[in-house]
A protein has these predicted regions:
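Active-site acidic/histidine proton-transfer and metal-coordination neighborhood
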Residues: 1-105
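Histidine-acidic metal/acid-base catalytic patches
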Residues: 28, 59, 63, 71, ...
Length: 216
């Protein structure tokens, strides 16, 4: 989404190359991350990130990438987050429709999109919008959690699985219903916290009636 054509062109070429590598590795898909106008990092806020101008630029960039993905037989898995140009379930659906390719899907990562008290305290309703609008496009998911920090100004932080506010059993249940063959990545867990997070994931999976396939 960078307005500098040289920088944007280099990024487009990088993702095109990733499509070719993904095909050679016979991997299921590769991520498409929207970026940011903020020069300090791709997952940081900027006043223009939610504008139609940046959205249209992202659509145009993706159309250049998607032809390579189609030729290579590779799926692109769209990521997003509230601070990014893909800031809601509705915006993600609008983006997928605008690009108009069967090779563009969606990675369910709802924690990235939490942006209000109402969403934080009603995560089932929040999750359901993503599954309703993007269920048919879902390729996989990231599993993590969040909490609200006790402070005057609204602030969210990631939390270890099992200690946060997301209804994980409902999330896994709906993932299993809409995309039973999905891969789900437990994300942003330090090594010393991985084992308890794993056990919590299994606990939520049992509550959701999910049996995981063995990885080979």
């Amino acid at each position: 989404v960078n307005p500098d054509q040289t920088i944007r062109g280099n990024c487009i070429k990088f993702v095109q190359d990733m499509c070719e590598l993904t095909s050679k590795l016979e991997a299921p898909n590769t991520y498409l991350r929207p970026g940011s106008i903020n020069t300090n990092g791709p997952w940081l806020p900027h006043p223009e990130n939610h504008t139609d101008k940046v959205f249209d630029r992202l659509v145009n960039s993706t159309k250049e990438i998607i032809t390579v993905a189609e030729n290579e037989g590779v799926m692109l898995s769209l990521e997003g987050g509230y601070v990014s140009p893909i800031f809601s379930a509705k915006r993600a659906k609008e983006f997928i429709d605008a690009v108009g390719s069967k090779n563009l899907g969606f990675n369910q990562d709802p924690v990235n999109f939490i942006s209000s008290i109402e969403q934080a305290y009603n995560t089932r309703e929040f999750l359901e919008e993503f599954f309703t609008l993007l269920g048919n496009h879902t390729l996989g998911a990231h599993l993590k959690d969040f909490t609200i920090i006790d402070t005057l100004l609204l602030r969210f932080e990631e939390e270890y699985i099992g200690s946060g506010m997301m209804d994980q059993a409902y999330f896994l249940k709906r993932m299993n219903e809409i995309c039973p063959d999905a891969h789900i990545l437990v994300e942003h867990i330090p090594r010393d916290k991985f084992e308890p997070s794993y056990h919590k994931t299994i606990e939520y999976s049992n509550a959701a009636g999910i049996k995981w396939e063995s990885y080979k």
